[in-house]
């Protein structure tokens, strides 16, 4: 936006002297001024099926973790008691605010059912190469509209070009690309996906999801293992079975119970509270000398002391 200030260097950040620095990742330059606030990239769904979800890894960078709901808060509160050098505030996820607006919660009135196909960028989990042929068949066999929207990190030109070509050849297909488009999510009646974190975000709109070989299938999904099962699964999802939709609502509430569009405001309130009283009684953060050296090397910032 024209009224925003963009800081392009470490020195500009330091001169700006922020009260707080927010990041969706799991690291932050320790030499930036202000309270270090973790907002998270997504929810703890552990899509890669790792032994321990990196969502909960504590590296000693942050003063404040703004958690989303019970799925993250309960674990972080345990870590807060164990570590003692940060505070946890359950605020809800700022990005969730867009999904619970009155405009987004009203379903689009589609003449024909609309399927949003989205896929993760993770090579071992992406369904894009495996489902292209079946999706093309369904474009002919079913009276459905399709929207193709991929994760921004999915950059394989062969995959993207194939779906671009499909969209140009079939009038009932639209290619959005490897970008996030909330409008496309609002237009869709159902999502077809694999193990992308966007599944949960789509469910915030109270819509069903069909997955292909999901890494953590549950009763809130219709998961299939073979391409030929996709069509019947989508047909079932479009009927919005009561049991499925109950599971969807329970699952989303566990991750994100804050539906008042004030998650972003609560984050700012959390920073104010931390500055006023939340910092009292905290231990010092770990020295992290090696990590700090690596951080300075990454940003080419060498003033001392570290």
PLM regions: where:
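Short acidic-hydrophobic, aromatic-tinged amphipathic segments that line or gate anion-handling sites
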Residues: 4-10, 173-178, 221-236
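Hydrophobic/aromatic beta-strand patches that form the interior of the parallel beta-sheet core
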Residues: 22, 37-38, 64-66, 89-91, ...
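Active-site and donor-binding regions of nucleotide-sugar-utilizing enzymes
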Residues: 1-101
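A donor-sugar binding/catalytic signature common to diverse glycosyltransferases
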Residues: 26-40, 178-221
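Conserved catalytic-core segment of nucleotide-activated headgroup transferases in glycan assembly
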Residues: 89, 94-164, 259-265
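Catalytic binding pocket for nucleotide-activated donors in carbohydrate/polymer assembly enzymes
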Residues: 59, 84-85, 165, 197-259
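Donor nucleotide-activated moiety binding/catalytic core segment of transferases
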Residues: 8-14, 156-203
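C-terminal amphipathic helix plus adjacent low-complexity
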Residues: 238-306
């Amino acid at each position: 936006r024209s009224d925003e200030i963009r800081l392009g260097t470490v020195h500009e950040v330091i001169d700006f002297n922020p009260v707080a620095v927010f990041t969706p990742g799991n690291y932050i330059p320790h030499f930036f001024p202000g309270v270090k606030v973790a907002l998270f990239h997504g929810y703890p769904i552990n899509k890669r099926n790792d032994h321990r979800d990196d969502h909960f890894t504590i590296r000693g960078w942050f003063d404040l973790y703004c958690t989303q709901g019970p799925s993250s808060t309960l674990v972080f509160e345990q870590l807060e008691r164990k570590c003692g050098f940060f505070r946890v505030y359950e605020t809800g996820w700022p990005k969730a605010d867009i999904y619970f607006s009155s405009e987004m919660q009203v379903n689009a009135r589609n003449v024909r059912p609309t399927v949003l196909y989205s896929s993760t960028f993770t090579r071992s989990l992406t369904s894009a190469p495996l489902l292209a042929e079946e999706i093309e068949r369904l474009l002919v066999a079913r009276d459905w509209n399709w929207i193709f929207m991929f994760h921004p990190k999915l950059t394989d030109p062969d995959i993207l070009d194939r779906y671009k070509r499909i969209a140009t050849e079939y009038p009932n297909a639209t290619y959005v690309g490897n970008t996030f488009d909330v409008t496309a999510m609002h237009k869709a009646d159902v999502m077809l996906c694999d193990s992308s974190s966007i599944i949960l975000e789509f469910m915030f709109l109270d819509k069903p999801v069909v997955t292909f070989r999901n890494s953590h299938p549950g009763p809130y999904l219709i998961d299939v293992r073979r391409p030929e099962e996709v069509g019947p699964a989508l047909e079932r999802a479009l009927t919005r079975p009561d049991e499925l939709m109950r599971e969807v609502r329970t699952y989303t509430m566990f991750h994100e119970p804050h539906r008042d569009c004030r998650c972003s405001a609560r984050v700012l309130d959390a920073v104010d509270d931390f500055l006023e009283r939340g910092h009292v009684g905290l231990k010092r953060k770990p020295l992290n000398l090696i990590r700090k050296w690596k951080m300075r090397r990454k940003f080419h910032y060498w003033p001392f002391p570290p």
